[in-house]
């Protein structure tokens, strides 16, 4: 793995092993990132198997061209530089209308967090950017400096679940009236200034939730995940599986709800037989989310909030 794209893969074996890999199968890594999951999955495929890898970050694909070279040379890998919300259309265009499994590792990859100029981190001074796709137009700068007060409050509450959303939005509104807010440090200091002193003594950085909220807005992360996971569930073959790693409650809630809707049946009480078209199409492989082991948590602090949910298609 190239030094500039160092990424420790979370829940590596659990995520891939629970896909119950068929050596000749067709699989998708919807979030290539540091290519850790892809490399492990490819090690389980025969030369007849194939993996399609999505990422909207060209650096992730460039890195994978090196780390997965032996599989690329055998024609087992296809890279697709795009947001995974376009997964179904892009696969269909390649003649793929059914897959045996897919995995998602949602959120920001370590290299994106560590690359100062990307503007994802409140711990490093950088321009307000936060774009996962460097070619997209909306940046954190636009959100912070142009969104109306009420829109900021809504985003901070909805995506950051921060109870001081109004106070923070007001502080931002006051500051940008004097001059634009240009850097992550400026924004982090404004967030700290908007919170009461006792709040600042609590564990964790006071800007964490607001930075998360802005990042989700800039990249439409939840909208993209919702669309993509639903499309992936449609594409799955019978007995195909989907693994989703989430890192915060909003992603986990979304995944849990989508899996629940597909794996439960809502029929009137007393109905003697469940109509065929009302039967569940999925079953949960694990009733509760799978969490990182103690040893993984010790080795990788970024794994602390990770949760893995897995579902299996039982009816087309």
Swiss-Prot record:
Biological process GO annotation list? rRNA base methylation
In terms of domain of life, where is this protein from?
Bacteria
Subcellular location, record wording: Cytoplasm
What are the annotated GO cellular component locations? cytoplasm
Q: Which HAMAP family match?
A: 16SrRNA_methyltr_H (MF_01007)
Q: Which gene encodes it?
A: rsmH
Reaction catalysed by this enzyme:
cytidine(1402) in 16S rRNA + S-adenosyl-L-methionine = N(4)-methylcytidine(1402) in 16S rRNA + S-adenosyl-L-homocysteine + H(+)
Q: Which GO terms describe its molecular function?
A: rRNA (cytosine-N4-)-methyltransferase activity
* Identification of the protein by name: Ribosomal RNA small subunit methyltransferase H
Binding site residues for S-adenosyl-L-methionine: 35-37, 55, 84, 105, 112
Return the similarity comment. Answer: Belongs to the methyltransferase superfamily. RsmH family.
Under Enzyme Commission nomenclature, its number is 2.1.1.199
Is Methyltransferase one of the keywords? yes
Gene3D superfamilies attached to this UniProt entry = Putative methyltransferase TM0872, insert domain, Vaccinia Virus protein VP39
Reported function: Specifically methylates the N4 position of cytidine in position 1402 (C1402) of 16S rRNA.
Q: What class of enzyme is it?
A: transferase
Q: Extract the InterPro entries matched here.
A: RsmH (IPR002903), SAM-dep_MeTrfase_MraW_recog (IPR023397), SAM-dependent_MTases_sf (IPR029063)
Keyword list, A-Z: Cytoplasm, Methyltransferase, rRNA processing, S-adenosyl-L-methionine, Transferase
Q: Which Pfam families match?
A: Methyltransf_5
